[in-house]
Structures are given as structure tokens and as C-alpha cells.
Amino acid sequence: MKLPLLLALVVCSAVSTNLKMVSKRNSVDGCIDWSVDLKTYMALAGEPVRVKCALFYSYIRTNYSMAQSTGLRLMWYRNKGDLEEPIIFSEVRMSKEEDAIWFHSAEEQDSGFYTCVLRNSTYCMKVSMSLTVAENESGLCYNSRIRYLEKSEVTKRKEISCPDMDDFKKSDQEPDVVWYKECKPKMWRSIIIQKGNALLIQEVQEEDGGNYTCELKYEGKLVRRTTELKVTALLTDKPPKPLFPMENQPSVIDVQLGKPLNIPCKAFFGFSGESGPMIYWMKGEKFIEELAGHIREGEIRLLKEHLGEKEVELTLIFDSVVEADLANYTCHVENRNGRKHASVLLRKKDLIYKIELAGGLGAIFLLLILLLVVYKCYNIELMLFYRQRFGGDETTDDNKEYDAYLSYTKVDQDTLDCDNTEEEQFALEILPDVLEKHYGYKLFIPERDLIPSGTYIEDLTRCVEQSRRLIIVLTPDYILRRGWSIFELESRLHNMLVSGEIKVILIECTELKGKVNCQEVESLKHNIKLLSLIKWKGPKSSKLNSKFWKHLVYEMPIKKKEMLSHCHVLDSAEQGLFGELQPIPSIAMTSTSATMVPSQADLPEFHHSDSMQMRHCCRGYQHEMPANTLSVPSLGNHHTYCNLPLTLLNGQLPLNNSLKETEEFSRNNPLLPLTSKELSFTSDIW
């Protein structure tokens, strides 16, 4: 009888001693209420869970057996609002076992607070425990609301234990625990070791963060507990660092009175283990809360975060800046390692400064516009100036004989319309004359320079290959006759155009819209890889200082300009006997021919078609007549020179004796045109 009484006194003494060490949270009707214990019980629906009375583990220095032997009773209640309802244990799904409640198969409706009360006639104390039961989230083996949380610094050692496993441990053996990461089996690397019911990571890396689930079987049911591991940076030993304003470098902000203003304060916080960054503004020795109502702080914004390291921003807001606000403002940042600060000085904006700034920006803007306009209007002139001063010579060592191949249509003068005369005269006379005599380019003109050595197509292809540019003059007659067909039908010429082997200069002498074959011209443009399009606009383009000639020279090969004498204008086939002759305009040639040549009816075998075909093969040249030479009054000092027939050049004479006199007359008369037979190798389109 004395022994139980002595034991009761010891228990009561232990309880009383413990109560002196822990401050009471509440006391109702003489019963000490410790409110809700910090430990939270969590389980998935359908799994077993054990809720222990926290009094025996955190609040008194005794266990359930000793308390029971002294006459103390343990009773369980479930909190429903402000009421505590006694629990009736059914022994089927929920039962009482010593100091705990066993849920053999927990359900979501079991979630709530459970209170254990330990009392006798003299003493009473109680504490509540929280239980949360939830279903698995879709496709997962856990619910994110009932995860345990663990943190570890990167490169440190971390052990993740399986929570509450002691409740399911049998005395004779350790539980067989299986670990998963993100609900999937994983082949752990060598530095991750399973140690009993725990997982040991010897050196934590950033990718080790995630959800770890431990699983075991207990009485035929699965028990799973999930722990979220958050990997952080190493614990910092430095105070935060201000990013703006700069530390030890006060920033000056020019403000306009009456206008709103926002001043951001940005700072970097290393990982310190604290719940949140501490950042605030002050004006002198006063906090912002002590100032006028038109000045306030915004919300702290998280700009960046990585492994617990944060970059945050706090904005100082002025609804309307007044004169009294022109002062120094300081942004303070701190953690448990120290404090840093940075300052901003508000200064009234000077109107003159604003005008100067606007004027300077305006001047720069106008200068840029002026330069843009100058370049837009004179870009070709600028490029030509640069090429003349600093450019090289494109014709050096390229193994090409001609600067350009000139392709145009040879038209009979009598068939020209009055509307097309200017275009055809430009193609036949003005264009080659200016390029060769004024700019010193060497052109290949098939009518003049083609010397047959094989078939016509082969000779033409060879000459195009020897040229650096291909100039196509789109006159009305050229378009009508589809003069470009040869460049599409002959495969070698076509390949040169589409591959960019030769650059093509396309000169439009007329408006293409509405013309016959205009669609084919557009198709030709699309097929040429290197194409430059230049438009000739009639007489105003004929002036040497016009935009047309500058553009044309810009597209021609880069070469050093050479002043040519009149004798150099003639090609090699025209030198020798006629080397000193000077060219005269076609009008003079026509008048000369009309004066000296007998009438067409008087010439034997003279055909009108031959005359039209050969009119462009004759050229007039001017030279000084010797004093002792008898001049023809109707001619003055003009002579007319025609190309020699190929039959004469080759030393061949016709076999037909009946035509001997006529042919002899033709050979001895320099004013007659070549016959169609002698020019059988030529073409109307060059």
C-alpha cells in the first residue's frame, strides 16, 4: 500500500516540476491547455496512421505506464469547432492503444484536431494534435499538401529519414523500405546510399532537389511518406548588397515639381536561412511611414531567385513631388550578418538643361536626316567618287577582252516609227558612242566586231564569255522581236545568266506595261541572278551629267579611265588603211551617201532590202584632204567608208562570169553597201 502511494507522489512531483519549466498557454477550469502541438500527422487515404499523445513526449517527464500506475487517466476528444467530443473507439477502423490512437485505414473525413487529456482529481493537462488525410494527386504517389520538408545546402551532407517509421517497426526486424524520387524508381549514383530506413546523400548537388517517397508494407497495406528536399546555396556570412542605388556612390535624380516619381531600390540577398529579405527606405532619420501621406513604399518584389539567393526590389513612390521632397533618401538592406545602405538625392530639374538637351537631340536628329537624304539622292555619286579615289581595277588579270557585250536590235531606218526613233537612235548611236569614246570602255558590238570562225551561236557565246558585262537594250523593236530569245535557247548563255557568271545591265528605253511580250520580259528579269535595271528617259537622260549615265558607269566594271584618241575607237579589223579616218554623225553619212551614190535604179542587181540591211554597216569618217587633191564640191572633206566584203578579205572571187562586171564595179566602188550574200552570217538582233 505504501509503494503505490510513493509512486504517485513521485509522478505528481515530476509533473509539477515539468510545469514550472514550460510556460502555460491556457488554463480553463483548472486544466492546463497546451493548445496545438507543433508536430503534424499526415497520411494518404487508405493508409494506417498512429496519432500519439504529445504530453508524454514534449511536456512532462513521464510515460504512459507511470502515469497510469499513479491513477492518472488518459482520455481522447475530437475537436468540433469550440466543442470537444469524446471519441468512441469502434476497434474496426480506429482503436486506442496505450498513449496513441490507431487509424487502421485513414479517410479524408478523419482530418482534424485530436485532444488528449491527462487528469486525476488534483491535476489536469491537455494538448491537441493535428491530423491531415488526403488522396493522391492525379498521376502521383503523394499529395503536395501532406509532404514533409527538408533543406540542405549545396555540397553538404544530408540524410533524409522516412517519417513515423518507428510506429510500424516490429521488434524483431527492421522495416523493408523502398525509396522513390518523383514516384519513380531511380538508380542512385554512388554518393547516395540507403542506410536503414534513411537515404544518405554524401554531397548534395542542385539536381538532388525534389520529392523523395519512402514505401513499406504494414499488415498488408502500403505506407508511404513523401519528403520534399529543397537545395539551397551555401549559408552566406555577408550582408546584402545594394544594386541600385550604388553603395558609397549617391545617385542624383533630376525631378520636375508636381510630377509623380518612382525610385526603385534593388538589392541582392545571399541565402541566410531567414524567412524574408529586410529592405526599407528612410529620409534622414525618419522612416517613410512617418512622412507625409503622398510618399509611400510599394510592395517588395522578387526579381530573381536561385537556390535561396534573391534579388528584390522596393519602390519609393511619390504621388506628386513638392519642394520639401528635394532631399536625400536612403535605402537600407540587412540580414543577420549586417546592414548596407545606398542613397539617392532628389534635385530640381533645370529648364535650361532640358532645352539644351532637346536642342542637342534635335540637332543630331536633323543631321541624321540630312545625311540620309544626301545618301539617298547622291549614293551613286558617292560610290563613284570612292571608286575613283580608292578603287582598284576590275579588269586586271580576269582574262576577258571586252568590258561589255551590247545586245540590241538592228532596225531599218525606213521602218522606224516616229515614236520609236529616239529609243532606236539611243541604242544604235548614243549608247556605244558615249561608253567607248567618253568613258573609255571596250564594247563588243556584234554588227561591228563579230568575226565568224564557226557557227553563229558558237561565235556569239564565245564573245559573251569574253565580256565582263552583258548590256541588253530593251527598245520597242527589241521587245517586239523577242531579242532575248537567244539567251534562253542557248544553254551555255542561259546558264551564265541564271548562275550569275555574268552581270546583266538591263536598259529600259520604253514603258513595258501594255507592250507585247512584256510578261516574257518580266520572266527574264526573274531568271537573271545578277541584274541591274536602268531606265532611259529620253533626251533628259542623254546629258553626260544625268543620273542615267552615272548609274550605268556605276554598274560597269571598275577600271582606270583612259583618254582614247580617235584612232583607238576603231577595232583591230578597221585599222591600217582607214586608221586615220575620223567618224562623222550618221546624218552626214546619209547625206554624203545620197550625194555620191547613183540612183538605185541605175545600179545593177541593187535590191531595196539589201540597202536597208547594209545601211548600218557603212560608217562615215572625216579627215584632212591634201592640198593637191581634187575635192568633190558636193562632199567637201567628207569620205564614206564601208566594211569590206568577206569574199574579198578571203581572197575569193565569184565563179559566175555573167556577174563579173557588176562585182568588179562593186569592188571598185567604195560607196556601195555590201550585198546580202556577203553578209549571210549576220543577224538583225545582236
Swiss-Prot record:
The protein's superkingdom reads Eukaryota
List residues traversing the bilayer: 355-375
Q: Which residues does the UniProt record annotate as the domain TIR?
A: 400-556
Kindly provide the name given to this protein in its UniProt entry. X-linked interleukin-1 receptor accessory protein-like 2
Please list the residue ranges that the record places on the Cytoplasmic side of the membrane: 376-686
Q: Which GO terms describe its molecular function?
A: interleukin-1, type II, blocking receptor activity; NAD+ nucleosidase activity, cyclic ADP-ribose generating
Gene3D superfamilies in alphabetical order? Immunoglobulins, Toll/interleukin-1 receptor homology (TIR) domain
Catalytic activity annotated for this protein? Answer: NAD(+) + H2O = ADP-D-ribose + nicotinamide + H(+)
Q: Does the keyword Signal apply?
A: yes
The family database entries (PANTHER family) matched by this protein are listed as:
INTERLEUKIN-1 RECEPTOR FAMILY MEMBER, X-LINKED INTERLEUKIN-1 RECEPTOR ACCESSORY PROTEIN-LIKE 2
> What EC number(s) does the entry state?
3.2.2.6
Q: How does it sit in the membrane?
A: Single-pass type I membrane protein
Q: Which residues form the signal peptide?
A: 1-16
Positions on the Extracellular side per record topology: 17-354
Q: Which organism is it from?
A: Mus musculus
The entry sums up its family as follows:
Belongs to the interleukin-1 receptor family.
Q: What residues make up the catalytic site? A: E488
Offer a single GO CC term for the protein: glutamatergic synapse
Task: Name the GO terms of the biological process aspect.
Answer: regulation of presynapse assembly
